[in-house]
Amino acid sequence: MARVLIVGAGAAGLMAAGAAVRQGHQVTVLEHTDKPGQKILVTGKGRCNVTNDCPAEEFLRHVRTNPRFLYSSLGAFPPAKTMELFEALGVELKVERGRRVFPVSDKAEEIRQALLRYAQDAEIVYDGAKKLLLEELPPELEAAPAVPENPRHPKKKKAGPALRCVGVRGTSGKEYRADAVLVATGGVSYPTTGSTGDGYRLAQQAGHTLVEPVPSLVSLVSHDPDCKKMMGLALKNVTLTLFEDGKDIFEEQGEMLFTHFGISGPLTLSASSHLGDMKKHTYCAEIRSEERRVGKECRSRWSPYH
């Protein structure tokens, strides 16, 4: 039995805690807010889109950046297993258009409670993670690389001794020691729910290099005043096409919403991950409907997004 310390009691942290407990480990979860799983409650308009009922291969096709990174994870735990897990935890699921999976209750709280039950044998400590506790790794324990080094692209030699993480110092000043430390803090997408970017700071402390984060799954802003006039207009079964410098780079059918600043909704969030550098490219969107009248009106009222 190993002592496992997990930083973050969101969906990932609770899933990891439950899995580690079932492997016989002693698990402690650090959470810097007073309520685990807060961000779950705002996903899917408060309904929580659990997963998509599709093969892992199709799932990966929709990952814009480095999908290979997720091969092993989705291979070991594909969407079907996610559905099986929640059904085993007592959550009745349904599959909607686009193969999106939601709880029948349409309540994200049911998913949060299921994850808390799954991780109930882990200890949740309400304390933040201020600093990783690092120790020098003895030379005899330094593992050989799993993959032979490519002579054409040799890796840079690290300066100084190899280090291993043996715990975390909490914001309270208390030290939490463990045989394994898992960082599951999420990103910086929703600070009010606890996603404040602590994981980036901890990763840097461990010597990792960070790729600059960019916005994704976000609403889009339009500078066309007519767009604001349609605020509150919700569209279903429309096709959204996104153009970059006149070339179509995304097209999908679904739901979207006009807001006081532009467009939002599931379709828009999916399209946003295809956007590049706004300073280097010009973007515009086209909205089409099976009903020609609606499609024509929406197209005439949309302007490029810069």
Predicted regions and their residues:
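An anion/pyrophosphate-binding glycine-rich loop and adjacent beta-alpha core
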Residues: T28, D34-P36, V42, V50, ...
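Rossmann-like dinucleotide-binding cores of NAD(P)H-dependent redox enzymes
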Residues: E92-L115, A206, L210-M231
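Glycine-centered tight beta-turn/hairpin loop motif at sheet-sheet or coil-to-beta transitions
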Residues: T171-G173, K247
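N-terminal Rossmann-like FAD-binding beta1-loop-alpha1 element of flavoenzymes
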Residues: R3-V29
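Conserved N-terminal/central alpha/beta ligand/cofactor-binding core
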Residues: H32-A122
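Glycine-rich loop(s) and the adjacent beta-strand/alpha-helix scaffold that form part
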Residues: A180-D226
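A conserved short coil-to-beta-strand element within the FAD-binding core of flavoproteins
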Residues: V125-R164
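Short hydrophobic core segments
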Residues: V7, Y176-S189, M256-T259
